[in-house]
């Protein structure tokens, strides 16, 4: 997938996928549940971006609710997302050593 934001190209085929967070939302009294996928990517120039996808989950599978969206992130925003979603090892491999 390719996106342009603020006159910059973001391409999921050339960027490195760091992690995808999956969330499932059960909807009582509904035949359709919801699932979200948030994927953190790092470009070769060090920029980060988050791809957000939403799906309806029914008995026969997942169906997109809308087009995927992109959110360019600063390194600090990417670190905050990573603190909540990455293992310690993956965090250090992505951002480098941290102090104790």
Stretches with model-predicted labels:
Residues 1-100:
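Secondary-structure transition motif
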